[in-house]
Amino acid sequence: PHGNGVKRETVPEDATHIRFDVIRSIDRPLINAEIASQLDFKVATELDLQIYTLQRRYLDYQVNIANRMIEALQNGNAPEAQRLSAVKTKFQDMIDRLFAETGKTIIRTANEIRFLQIGEELTPYQLSSGEKQMLVILLTVLVEDNQPYLLLMDEPEVSLHIDWQQQLIELITTLNPNAQIILTTHSPALIMNGWMDSVTEVSEIEVPQTDSK
């Protein structure tokens, strides 16, 4: 036990490291001019920077999955090849369903994440803040490749409308059942669909201040 209400366990018990991802929610302008000058001119905000980084991970993920599918097919294991491809399709279906109200769909033949909207091709940098936020979260979970990960999120409800907030945890656990989620939130909508028992109030884990005298 570590403090009140918090317990740390690792599987296996002798694990030497923990894979983790950190997702930041605020879509504020990049303040580091040096970083901004080295990137695509369309990368203007912190969410844009996360998308830019994730695009690189997404390319690596696709190459890795393709190699494993080829190996499975060469070994005569077609069901395994189908299982490997199904997760990416599930991610694409999720995004298409979430963005359906604005008519955006993922271009499934593109190597990078791109969208079609009424015949016009869009980059992810042209999405709304809420759409960027949801894309960052779900793409992060996808490229974790079903591995055990610690997913840290600070107020992920920022910019997400209420329906998306209610679906968020279920979407994450569907894409990667091996992800452990730790998040801070002020939104009851995030935890109202069966997650109330997993909530820890900050007051339960605060360390009492002692008199320094």
Which stretches of residues belong to each language-model region?
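Switch/communication elements of ASCE P-loop NTPase nucleotide-binding domains
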Residues: 93, 107-213
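Phosphate-coordinating catalytic segments in nucleotide- and nucleic-acid-processing enzymes
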Residues: 1-123
